Amino acid sequence: MNLEKPKWPDGKKCAAMLTINLNAELFWLQIDPSCKDMPKTLSLGQYGMTRGVDRILSILKERGIKATFFTPGWVAEQYPDKLKKIKEEGHEIASLAYKHENMALLTEEEQEEAMKKGIEAIQNVCGVTPVGFRAPEGELTLDTLRIAKKYGMHYSSNLCDDDRPYQKDLENGETLLEIPIHWDNYDLPYFAFNYHPAF
């Protein structure tokens, strides 16, 4: 284990990455497809797009902070005006596949299709090509990371094995920058695992 103090650019003391997973109602639909008939449950995701995005953007602007919005391609297609606003305000739009697929359960070909469709949707809506990738709920395989690299991703933000960025060995002679995440810093576990039977 390397316990040396990291050397950050410009003599900075530390680095942090603020990320938002912009799943909208898609998160709920992927957990349980029957949610399509549950307006209250769907409204939890729709609220983020109706009010949450604008409020987050306002706070970020007020504080002078830039963030990364990991976005499924489907969400970009459903909410193009929100995605364009995020881009116009100078935030990064990164890929969260196409339709919140559990990449670990897909074949390599299916993963590639989800990656490709997600990237193309963001390109079509925003005119930018994402360079960062997060698998929905971090469910992925080593093949997923190789596919991300193949499709031009500069980094992944999925794994929880460090608190510093590092080069992840893809076991094929290549590496991909990993910017680790930590579930204890997410709001999702406190929220998502309590939606049944109340809704």
Could you say what each language-model-derived stretch is?
Residues M1-G132, E137-Y186:
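Catalytic alpha-helical scaffold of carbohydrate-active enzymes acting on polysaccharides/glycoconjugates
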Residues H182-F199:
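Catalytic grooves of carbohydrate-active enzymes
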